[in-house]
C-alpha cells in the first residue's frame, strides 16, 4: 500500500488572524503559510528588554517604541510579520483587514538568533525595507557585541556595523546609543554570556 502525503492547503489572511487570536505563541504569515515563531534565549530576551529601556528613554515627538507583540502588514508582499521591537512615528496606520497590524514603522529592530539570522538579514529585511515609512532596520547580535544598522538615505539603503566602544544613532531618537549599554550585564566584551 502506498502512503499519500497530504500537503496543507495555503491559508488566507483571515485564517491566519483567526489562528493568531487563539494561539499562545506568535506566528508570521508568509506566502499563505502560517509560520510559528520560536521562543528566545535568555540573552535574546534580556537584550530585547534592554533595547526597550534604552529606546523608550530616547523617544521624541510623536514617536514611540513598540515591543515584539506589534504585528506589521507588508502590503506589497501580502505578509504579516513581527519584529523584536520597533519605533512608529505619528499615529499607527492599520490596514482595513487587520486592526491589530500596522503599516508604518519608522525603525524595526531584530535580535538575531541562529535559527532566524538568515531570514532577519535576508527576506524579512527586504520585506520591511519595502515599506515607504521605514528609515532604519537594526540587527542586534546576541552572541557578540555587534549592531548592524541599515539606513535609508535619499531612497538608497546603506549599512554600518557597530561594535563594542561604538555608539549609533537612529532617526527619531534624542541621543545616540552606546553598543556597550545594550549588552551590559548580558555579554562580556568577548561575547561570553554573563547569564550562565
Language-model features, listed with the residues they occupy:
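Gly/Pro/Ser/Thr-rich low-complexity, intrinsically disordered segments predominantly at protein N-termini
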Residues: 1-196
Amino acid at each position: 500500500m502506498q502512503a499519500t502525503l497530504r500537503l496543507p492547503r495555503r491559508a488566507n489572511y483571515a485564517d491566519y488572524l483567526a489562528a493568531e487570536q487563539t494561539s499562545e505563541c506568535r506566528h508570521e504569515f508568509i506566502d499563505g503559510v502560517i509560520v510559528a515563531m520560536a521562543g528566545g534565549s535568555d540573552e535574546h530576551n534580556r537584550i530585547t528588554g534592554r533595547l526597550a529601556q534604552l529606546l523608550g528613554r530616547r523617544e521624541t515627538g510623536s514617536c514611540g517604541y513598540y515591543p515584539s507583540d506589534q504585528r506589521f502588514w507588508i502590503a506589497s508582499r501580502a505578509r504579516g510579520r513581527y519584529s523584536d521591537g520597533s519605533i512608529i512615528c505619528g499615529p499607527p496606520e492599520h490596514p482595513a483587514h487587520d486592526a491589530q497590524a500596522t503599516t508604518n514603522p519608522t525603525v524595526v529592530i531584530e535580535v538575531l538568533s541562529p535559527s532566524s539570522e538568515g531570514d532577519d538579514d535576508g527576506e524579512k529585511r527586504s520585506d520591511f525595507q519595502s515599506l515607504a515609512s521605514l528609515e532604519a532596520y537594526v540587527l542586534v547580535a546576541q552572541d557578540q557585541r555587534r549592531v548592524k544598522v541599515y539606513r535609508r538615505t535619499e531612497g538608497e539603503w546603506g549599512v554600518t556595523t557597530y561594535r563594542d566602544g561604538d555608539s549609533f544613532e537612529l532617526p527619531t531618537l534624542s541621543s545616540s546609543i552606546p553598543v556597550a549599554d545594550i549588552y551590559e550585564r548580558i555579554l562580556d566584551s568577548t561575547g561570553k554570556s554573563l547569564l550562565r
